[in-house]
Amino acid sequence: MAVTAETSMPGANSNDRQSAAANDAGGMPAPRRTRASAEAARYGVLRRLAPALKHDMVVNLQAISMMAEVLNAKLERGSPAPVEFHASIAKLNRLAREAVANCLKVASWIEPGEDEGVRLAEGVDDCLSLLASNFNFRGFVVIKDVPESPFQVSRVVLRHLLVASLITLTDAAQGPCEVHVKAEVVTGMAEISVRISPRQDGFEGLPFEANYRELEWQDVQALAQAESVELIRGTDNITMRMPRAIATAPLQIAPV
């Protein structure tokens, strides 16, 4: 189901100034520079998510391999009872279906299909779940304030901007922090804010070195400008305002 925005919000004023500066520089045209910056930011987000995406894709495949080895060992010892054999095959089929679903989910981060709407709370959880292991390792505690709401936003836009904001703020942190994530509907727009504050319990996170470059404020700006999302930056927080996602194509029923 493809979606479009109900309204279009301009990017931050700083983005407009950046576009003007690009034209004045006499180099790449501003629209092309904006697209290139957004693509670089998207690539940076995916590279930083790569370990988590790889884990999500491999975990079910490993389970299938282990189950197949167990079943093979039983067959080598002699034919198992029909009931036991059928139960093992059923479990193997279930694991295979879960593996396919997980692989398709990972692929949707790399190459999204038709954009679709997602409920705000579900979309936020989708992003936080991928960063959970990384944040735990580094000593970041997520405090979430995201009430359930039928309000939907673009899944692709939310993924890129929220993950970029979370990584940008935690990359800039001087140590373990509390990461406050709040999402609500304000005057017909989804307002998502991310704020960090130092932990007060003296916890020391493990040394961490990013698998790819650190993300910066310019990356978040480029993504927001490309998607026409309003963006506000504070000293230790980022707030974004996203329009409602509206379906523009009929639902497609997948063949069984």
Residue ranges, per PLM feature:
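Conserved signal-transmission helix
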Residues: 1-45
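Histidine phosphotransfer helical core of two-component systems
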Residues: 28-31, 35-38, 42-49, 60-98, ...
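Conserved ATP-binding N-box helix of the HATPase_c
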Residues: 47-70, 152-181, 213-227
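Conserved DHp (HisKA) dimerization/phosphotransfer helix of two-component histidine kinases, i.e.
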Residues: 67-70, 83-138
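Conserved short alpha-helical segment within the C-terminal cytosolic histidine kinase catalytic core
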Residues: 125-141, 164-171, 219
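Conserved catalytic submotifs in the C-terminal HATPase_c
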Residues: 141-150
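Glycine-rich/acidic phosphate-handling loop/turn and adjacent ATP-lid/helix
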Residues: 186-221, 242-245, 249-253
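Glycine-rich ATP-binding loops of the HATPase_c
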Residues: 225-240
